[in-house]
């Protein structure tokens, strides 16, 4: 870590364009900034305090006090109730949008207003970056006048962790959430089940849980921790494929021609729960009934991707009989009755379903959905090269869409040559920082043609990500680029500006013990 940190400092010194001012660490770039004339605000020990807010905003007030104290070494407290102070935060109902904030710094102090508590928290993160960027002023315990009026381009800015492949302890998930929050991410998706493991305790079916798993109380703890930082946690249970962990515990859920096969978690692949087996629906409904109350999010992600239908349902006598009765000619048509029954359990629990967007071909060209998705499903695009088609189809059929195109947003892909020396047998494509920055979630479409885009998601599939240090290494700095794609309007995005603002944030993450990748390749050799 020490050698990497020294290297980063040396690298930063070579970037002659870096201007140390109060904009040089803003990430993502705000959408409106003013520089009013006036004197700086001075942070004075014993006098600087945060005006006590409503109880619901106390955590944000304490966060602001901690930020200023840590950046300046000047103790900042919360003022006693009823006493005026030079740092104020309040809800302003005239600000439109769920995350619209206004941050004003003047000689008299700081005023942070927001449309919601979430908006105020986003503004607090901007305040922190102002202090990181203006190192000279911060060292002198002062802040320059500025007005930032800001709101996100897209409502959803998400990252996905995959503890199903490699388990992450609760403390590491919290650590990852802390880093997400700094860059205005507001959704964490947890991929909790896959062929390599089932990571959530299910009381009605205790055999499901792998040796390493989250108790239901631990998941509630993660949800609560994220909620304090205004991050929504969405659970993902991947079905009907990616279900080896289920079948290892309950082999009777296999298709008829595979019931005698031994299923080994982490080794067996391409197995699916049987669409014609009522027991499949009983178990999965029980699972949904237990998972749904653990998460405050209105969504449950149910996967639906990479289902090996030809090796399972197409060869299963029971599934073939189900097809015959329904008048189906293709085994993939069974996805419709399968998800009809599963999504009924989701709706009964007051939740909305999310699925990965699968088309009738896994490579371009593709023409239509793999099967007709129900109207209330939100889809996530992911397959390389198919996002433009997914974008058009979801607009045509009226489905909201989240953009996680593999060529831009798959953070498990290596960032440069040799980036995954211990795991390079898949031939995964390189996804550079600059390439990630090029993502326009609207794909250049007219406003109406991208109006159904909810936002972006960066995915960290964990076959090669064994711990949280590798997770953050693969995430940063690419998550800076994705955060800006989700938050900042296109006209305010600029690659050269981004590079300048990236370095102070990388340095700050490293000071916090976060493993990052230093992108030496983007610096021109002198």
Regions of interest found by a model, annotated:
Residues 358, 367-526:
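Flexible, acidic glycine-rich loops studded with aromatic residues
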Residues 1-25:
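Bacterial Sec-dependent N-terminal signal peptides
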Residues 19-152, 353-364, 373, 504-526:
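Acidic, contiguous N-terminal accessory segments
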Residues 261-264, 268-378, 382-398:
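Active-site neighborhood of glycoside hydrolase catalytic domains
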Residues 167-169, 195-199, 240-246, 301, ...:
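Flexible loop/turn segments at secondary-structure boundaries
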Residues 95-301, 315, 320-321, 341, ...:
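Feature activates predominantly on carbohydrate-active enzymes
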